[in-house]
From Swiss-Prot:
Pfam families, alphabetized: XH, XS, zf-XS
Keywords: Coiled coil, RNA-mediated gene silencing
Annotated gene: FDM3
Coiled-coil ranges from the UniProt annotation: 318-497
InterPro entries, sorted: FDM1-5/IDN2, FDM1-5/IDN2_XH, XS_domain, XS_domain_sf, Znf-XS_domain
Entry protein name: Factor of DNA methylation 3
GO biological process assignments: gene silencing by siRNA-directed DNA methylation
Protein's UniProt keywords contain Protein transport: no
Signal peptide: none
UniProt organism field: Arabidopsis thaliana
The keyword Nucleotide-binding appears for this protein: no
């Protein structure tokens, strides 16, 4: 079967070579004689060669064996006999297909033998002969035209050589030269054009071998005969290149292009893989950025709403103050008008009652002379009693706040008050007696002297008690300062020791309820930054002196008025609805502590605290706790 197909293919090749079937239409256009109705029946050399190779290599059962054999013969004819019409744009797929032509499925492939194609010298070389030479004067050597001059002459004729080398032997210029062309498809086309041109005007290789006598240059394309020739020309060709058929050259170029294609495909796949990874990362980053942007917008929106609310409250507060000011201004103007009216009425009444006022003034002057002494005495005594009562009330209030150690001071103060009252009474009685009973005789004088002595003794005792009282006050202040300094030292040393007697920051906000409530409500893990911003916002609220969410109530069991948290406050009510009772209670506790320990400054203060009983610790408890720690540390060291 294979032999019959091979013979059939050879016969078709001979017909094509003999010119019985038209293949070449023009210098650039060719056609397929076996496919008259095919769309590719007319085209460039590359297109027809690709079509013939494709049909010849086809494994489809729709193609008959004769159709495949005829197209393989056409491909062989194009490669062997019309290769000089090839261009440098032969496709990679065509070169790969022309490396071998498989037969039908199940048959052995028919492989082209490289020996059946003409082998040329590669890189492509042309041979120049019959170069004019002249002998030197001594007749020992010959000279001729140089390579560059021959190259310029070929270029003027329309050829495209890259170099022309003249061949020299031991006798000088041999009269031959080697024309070099580019080693690619363009170089091959230039070489074939060079060959055809000299063959066309009767100066080809066959013409030279037939013994031409023309003095012009003869040229042809260097092949295996020239390569293996045993002369100086063959020696130079063997040094400058190798033998290679056009078929083998196309096969090697196809392999190179195939490797390049594989490398490019690998690079494309690698770039696509990296692009896919970058797209995935971009998608993830876009989702994350979108979420963070939404969270940021939410926080900014909440902040803007809160700021707007605070500004609105400030505006409302200012408007209320301004309205109250205007109201008070109107009331004040009304009162001024009323006072002016009263002033006019009083002036009128004063003018009408001027006579009566003068009479009353005279009577008052007379009565004043009589009652002045009595009134002055009574007034002095009344002032003394009121002053004593005020002093007693003040000392009583101070006595409730002082420590037990000043009990002696309280007793001395009572004695001082009694003595002062007695002195004032004695002075008042003495003044009255001097004014009323100036003429009472010696008995009154004796009583006065007795009162004066008693008064002098009483004033001495009073001065002694005043000095003793001042000493006690100074000592008490000094002791109180020492106690406060000791308390501050305990607070500094017991800080962050984890004992039941320690330091509590009064008014500090407990953050745990906020974190817990936000995790439960929003069910997200990365809420720390958001929670910190919310906590900082409430810490700023606690420091704001304008925010006072308290109300005054009167206890039922006593007459005392106390301040409690106003549960109807807008901020506290919003906090309770948003984050629950625990966060609300944490803010309420901080407010109560600030209101108790530092209501004016509204900042956090440290206090010695009994955490076990949840109360303010005494100085004695703090000292005992510090001594226990010191004893434990001493025991561990020993």
């Amino acid at each position: 079967m294979n032999n019959k197909l091979s013979d059939f293919e050879k016969n078709l090749y001979k017909k094509l070579k003999s010119g019985k079937l038209e293949v070449k239409v023009s210098y650039r256009t060719f056609l397929c004689p076996y496919c008259p109705d095919n769309k590719k029946k007319v085209g460039l050399y590359v297109d027809i060669l690709q079509h013939a190779s494709g049909v010849g290599n086809s494994q489809s059962k729709k193609r008959s064996l004769t159709e495949k054999a005829s197209h393989r013969a056409l491909a062989k004819y194009l490669i062997k006999d019309l290769a000089h019409y090839a261009t440098s744009t032969i496709s990679k797929r065509l070169k790969a297909r022309t490396s071998f032509i498989p037969a039908e499925t199940g048959d052995a492939p028919i492989i082209y033998d490289d020996a059946q194609f003409e082998k040329l010298v590669w890189p492509w070389k042309g041979v120049l002969v019959n170069i004019p030479t002249t002998s030197t004067e001594d007749g020992r050597s010959c000279t001729g035209e140089s390579g560059p001059k021959l190259k310029d002459e070929l270029i003027r004729r329309g050829f495209n050589p890259i170099r022309v080398r003249t061949v020299w032997d031991r006798f000088g210029h041999s009269g031959t030269g080697i024309v070099e062309f580019n080693r690619d498809w363009n170089g091959l086309q230039d070489a074939l054009v060079f060959k055809k041109a000299y063959e066309g005007d009767g100066h080809g290789k066959k013409d030279w071998l037939c013994g031409a006598t023309d003095s012009s240059l003869y040229a042809w394309l260097a092949n295996a005969d020239d390569y293996y020739r045993a002369n100086i020309l063959g020696e130079n060709l063997r040094k400058m290149g190798d033998l290679k058929s056009i078929y083998r050259f196309a096969e090697e170029e196809a392999r190179k292009d195939q490797k390049l294609l594989q490398r490019l495909n690998f690079m494309v796949e690698n770039k696509q893989y990296r692009l896919k990874k970058l797209q995935i990362k971009y998608s993830q980053d876009s989702v994350k950025l979108k979420y963070e942007t939404e969270e940021k917008e939410k926080i900014l929106r909440a902040y803007s709403e809160d700021l707007t609310g605070r500004q609105q409250k400030s505006t409302d507060h200012f408007n209320r103050i301004f309205a109250d000011h205007e109201k008070q201004k109107v009331q004040l103007e009304s009162q001024i008008k009323e006072l002016e009216i009263r002033k006019l009425e009083l002036a009128k009444r004063e003018a009408e009652n001027e006579t009566q006022r003068k009479i009353v003034a005279k009577e008052l002057e007379q009565n004043a002379a009589i009652n002045s002494y009595v009134q002055l005495s009574a007034l002095e005594q009344q002032k003394t009693r009121e002053k004593a009562q005020r002093l007693a009330v003040d000392h009583k209030m101070q006595k409730e706040k002082l420590h037990k150690r000043i009990a002696a001071l309280e007793r001395q103060l009572d004695q001082k008050q009694e003595l002062e009252l007695e002195v004032q009474q004695l002075k008042s009685q003495l003044s009255v007696m001097r004014l009323v009973e100036l003429d009472s005789g010696s008995e009154i004088v004796n009583k006065v002297e007795t009162f004066l002595r008693d008064l002098s003794e009483t004033e001495g005792e009073l001065a002694h008690l005043n000095q003793f009282n001042q000493d006690l006050v100074v000592q008490e202040r000094k002791s109180n300062d020492e106690l406060q300094e000791a308390r501050r030292a305990l607070i500094s040393n017991l800080r962050d020791m984890g004992l039941h007697i320690g330091v509590k920051r009064m008014g500090e906000l407990d953050t745990k309820p906020f974190m817990k409530a936000m995790r439960i409500k929003y069910c997200q893990e990365d809420l720390e930054d958001w929670a910190v911003e919310v906590i900082q916002l409430w810490e700023e609220y606690l420091k704001d002196p304008d925010w006072h969410p308290f109300k005054r109530i009167k206890l039922e069991t006593a007459e005392t008025i106390v301040e409690v948290i106003d549960e109807d406050d807008e901020k506290l009510r919003t906090l309770k609805n948003e984050l629950g009772d625990d966060a609300y209670q944490a803010v309420a506790n901080a407010l109560l502590e600030i209101n108790e320990y530092n209501p004016s400054g509204r900042y956090i203060s440290s206090e010695l605290w009994n955490f076990r009983e949840d109360r303010k610790a005494t100085l004695e408890e703090g000292v005992n706790s510090l001594l226990e720690q010191w004893n434990q540390a001493k025991h561990l060291k020993s």
